[in-house]
């Protein structure tokens, strides 16, 4: 396997994936930070594409701050989620707020602290599960979806 990984590969033979990061920011009262995306109006976790020069933890802290104005301490990886339609692998981390003030950005039209029930009401299943997985303490979870529905493992 190591020999295979060290050999140059044809561009068409190796599938390319985008790596994104997202933060499940949990306040002491149990409310969860969410944004309404500016591009499509859906409610999701704050997050985005991991930059080449940053660690996943630094990336999630940057994305949460950029989209919400909230600084966070990153606790732990709670899930890995693959969008099989778009080729995106999302690393999701549970975080604690450590400062800042809620604000919108060019990527968000609303920032809100939701209860777990509100998460299920406002978010599509494939995004709500990321928050609910982070709360159950049994992670990290590994799941796949097609952008709309979870895909059963196996």
Region spans (language model):
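Acidic, metal-coordinating catalytic segment for phosphate/diphosphate chemistry
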Residues: 1-22
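Short, charged/polar surface micro-motifs in flexible loops or helix N-caps
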Residues: 26-31, 40, 51, 70, ...
């Amino acid at each position: 396997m190591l020999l295979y990984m060290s050999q140059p590969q044809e561009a068409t033979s190796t599938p390319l994936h985008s790596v994104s990061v997202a933060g499940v920011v949990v306040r002491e009262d149990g409310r969860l930070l969410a944004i309404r995306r500016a591009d499509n109006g859906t409610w999701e976790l704050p997050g985005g594409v991991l930059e080449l020069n940053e660690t996943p933890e630094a990336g999630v802290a940057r994305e949460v701050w950029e989209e919400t104005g909230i600084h966070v301490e990153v606790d732990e990886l709670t899930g890995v989620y693959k969008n099989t339609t778009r080729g995106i692998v999302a690393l999701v981390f549970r975080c604690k707020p450590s400062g800042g003030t809620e604000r919108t950005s060019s990527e968000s039209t609303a920032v809100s602290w939701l209860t777990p029930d509100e998460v299920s009401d406002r978010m599509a299943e494939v995004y709500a599960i990321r928050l609910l997985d982070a709360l159950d303490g049994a992670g990290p979870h590994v799941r796949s979806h097609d952008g709309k529905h979870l895909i059963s493992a196996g």
